[in-house]
């Protein structure tokens, strides 16, 4: 076999085992751990290339070959950083390995035939579509904005720009649940709705779950009392759905200890666990120490910068229907914004004590920045804290796996949808995001939804080639017509599926049920399962783990920022 230089190989087929790649303009470097393609037998499409009839393409019928192959992809997922071909069949991942013609090539696990389409992933990073679990359904255009950032699944509640939806992620009652399920049937992303969990009558919660929501949201603006928390968790345990909690900032109905007592060791997803987004002041952050608490952040406080504190007061006043002329409203808002706990939040993510990131879309958070801000935090922590002690070798692979899990597999596990989405694994929906390494986390090169391209940057439609300016993101065929129904999923509760809600509402999209919501624990959070001994000083708000002060310096400059948005 002839040899070529490592540089020439990377230029032709993408990086291979041992090669290092910088992520965007951050200080994060990954190293390829394994290469599942076979040296000398790589497949590539194009003039004079391998994927031609009788060469890398076989003669089998469609039943015996992939519908789509992503060739020579560099996969970043919680389970590894690996070079491989990815095979897709019927909208799902059916193999990760070596593509080609099994009649003449060795080690082929993904047959290529005349029915196979090719996406050239040489020199591209491929990640699973992101899962955002904190969506305020204020406007439907959020779906396209999220999709262009690499988010393919959106979980939350709302009914449009109402006072309730501007502040809380709740779709209240069967009538609104039905309307929102029908409205979402045409969105180009997977969705799951959260009902309003603020009720101490279990029947009022059961009917919402039976109508189709996949979880119940408890929000302080509707009253997050111990009775409400206990009732929602009781119904959730009965019907296998998740409960999401925005707890009582004002400590009116109890303190964080009372909320934990009401939770009673049952699984619960705590939203914006730092507290600037809401929750017991000043110590809701201590909830991350408990094995049944699945703690997440929303992106307004990520990463901590010199502008974070100043930005929050006005955002909070608008989103939570507060009046700047009422002193009590201003005091409420100010009680949630604490520099000390915000400064600790990034570190808790880096330690793996906080397990998820999400947006809080149009309700203090930015729906198109979950991916970007997650990686900005990872960069800041690398710069401030150095390599993680778990790292082996001159790379950031452990840190990268920790951070990618925060918006892919961990939210999917938390909300009972990991059997369908959240990672690049066989059997799951082919929701895949391709990135040029230089634009990683900022601007995807291609977004594949259910095995078909749903969104991509596209140039002048009257151009002679696809690339002339102006180039901007445009919906592709997976987002149009009846194809979008086959390429997306609406998640329902098991009760709603049993009741035939999809048929009653004449939903056209594929549906899937959530499961395992009540058994998932912090220990199941991939790379993010630390249970710290954490305290907050009630006077100074200083956060300590095992007595050691946990803080970080605010950033005055960030990667993945202005230089990427000049065009």
Swiss-Prot record:
GO biological process: urea catabolic process
Binding-site residues, substrate: 219
Keyword terms, alphabetized: Cytoplasm, Hydrolase, Metal-binding, Nickel
Coiled-coil regions listed in the entry: none
PTM statement from Swiss-Prot or TrEMBL: Carboxylation allows a single lysine to coordinate two nickel ions.
Listed PROSITE patterns: UREASE_1, UREASE_2, UREASE_3
InterPro entries the record matches: Amidohydro-rel, Metal-dep_hydrolase_composite, Metal_Hydrolase, Urease_alpha_N_dom, Urease_alpha_subunit, Urease_AS, Urease_asu, Urease_asu_c
GO cellular component, as recorded: cytoplasm
Catalytic residues (positions): 320 (proton donor)
Intracellular or extracellular location(s): Cytoplasm
Broad class of where this protein is predominantly found: cytoplasm
Segments forming domain Urease: 129-567
Binding site for Ni(2+) 1: 134, 136, 217, 360
Pathway as given in its UniProt record: Nitrogen metabolism; urea degradation; CO(2) and NH(3) from urea (urease route): step 1/1
Reactions catalysed, as given in the entry: urea + 2 H2O + H(+) = hydrogencarbonate + 2 NH4(+)
Free-text comment on the cofactor: Binds 2 nickel ions per subunit.
Enzyme Commission number: 3.5.1.5
Pfam families: Amidohydro_1, Urease_alpha
Residues reported in the UniProt entry to bind Ni(2+) 2: 217, 246, 272
Residue positions, PTM N6-carboxylysine: 217
Family, similarity comment: Belongs to the metallo-dependent hydrolases superfamily. Urease alpha subunit family.
Subunit structure and binding partners: Heterotrimer of UreA (gamma), UreB (beta) and UreC (alpha) subunits. Three heterotrimers associate to form the active enzyme.
Protein name: Urease subunit alpha
Species this chain originates from: Escherichia coli O157:H7
Protein's gene: ureC1
């Amino acid at each position: 076999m002839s040899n070529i230089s490592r540089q020439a190989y990377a230029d032709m087929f993408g990086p291979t085992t041992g090669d290092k790649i910088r992520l965007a303009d951050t200080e994060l470097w990954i190293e390829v751990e394994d290469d599942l393609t076979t040296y000398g037998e790589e497949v590539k499409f194009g003039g004079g290339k391998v994927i031609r009839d009788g060469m890398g393409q076989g003669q089998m019928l469609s039943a015996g070959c992939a519908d789509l192959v992503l060739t020579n992809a560099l996969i970043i997922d919680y389970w590894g950083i690996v070079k491989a071909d990815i095979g897709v069949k019927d909208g799902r991942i059916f193999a990760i390995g070596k593509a080609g013609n099994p009649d003449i090539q060795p080690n082929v696990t993904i047959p290529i035939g005349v029915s196979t389409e090719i996406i050239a992933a040489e020199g591209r990073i491929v990640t699973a579509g992101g899962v955002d679990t904190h969506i305020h359904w204020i406007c439907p255009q959020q779906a396209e904005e999220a999709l262009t950032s690499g988010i393919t699944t959106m979980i939350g509640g709302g009914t449009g720009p109402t006072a309730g939806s501007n502040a809380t992620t709740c779709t209240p009652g069967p009538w609104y649940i039905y309307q929102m399920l029908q409205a979402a049937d045409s969105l180009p992303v997977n969705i799951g709705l959260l009902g309003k969990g603020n009720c101490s009558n279990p029947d009022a919660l059961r009917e919402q779950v039976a109508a189709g929501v996949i979880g119940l949201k408890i929000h302080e603006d509707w009253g997050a009392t111990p009775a409400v928390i206990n009732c929602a968790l009781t119904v959730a345990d009965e019907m296998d759905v998740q409960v999401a909690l925005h707890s009582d900032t004002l400590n009116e109905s109890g303190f964080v200890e009372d909320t934990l007592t009401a939770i009673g060791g049952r699984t619960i997803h705590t939203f914006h666990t730092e507290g600037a987004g809401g929750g017991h002041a000043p110590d809701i952050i201590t909830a991350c120490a408990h094995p049944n608490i699945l703690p997440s952040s929303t992106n307004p406080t990520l990463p901590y910068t010199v502008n974070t504190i100043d930005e929050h007061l006005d955002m909070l006043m608008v989103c939570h229907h507060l009046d700047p002329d009422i002193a009590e409203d201003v005091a409420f808002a100010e009680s949630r914004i604490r520099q000390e706990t915000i400064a600790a939040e990034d570190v808790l993510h880096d330690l793996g004590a906080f397990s998820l990131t999400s947006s809080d879309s149009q309700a203090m958070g930015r729906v198109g920045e979950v991916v970007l801000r997650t990686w900005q935090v990872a960069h800041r922590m690398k710069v401030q804290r150095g390599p993680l002690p778990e790292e082996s070798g001159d790379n950031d692979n452990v840190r990268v796996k920790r951070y990618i899990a925060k918006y892919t597999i961990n939210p999917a596990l938390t909300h009972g949808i990991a059997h369908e989405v959240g990672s690049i694994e066989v059997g799951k929906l082919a929701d895949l995001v391709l990135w040029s390494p230089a634009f990683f986390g900022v601007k995807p090169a291609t977004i594949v939804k259910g095995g078909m391209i749903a969104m991509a940057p596209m140039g002048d439609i009257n151009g002679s080639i696809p690339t002339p300016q102006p180039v901007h993101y445009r919906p592709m065929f997976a987002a149009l017509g009846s194809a979008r129904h086959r390429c997306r999923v609406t998640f329902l509760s098991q009760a709603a599926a049993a009741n035939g809600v999809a048929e009653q509402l004449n939903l056209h999209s594929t549906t899937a049920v959530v499961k395992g919501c009540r058994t998932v624990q912090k220990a199941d959070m991939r790379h993010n399962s630390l249970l710290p001994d954490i305290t907050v000083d009630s006077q100074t708000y200083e956060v300590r783990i095992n007595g050691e002060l946990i803080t970080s310096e605010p950033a005055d400059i960030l990667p993945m920022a202005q230089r990427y948005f000049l065009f």
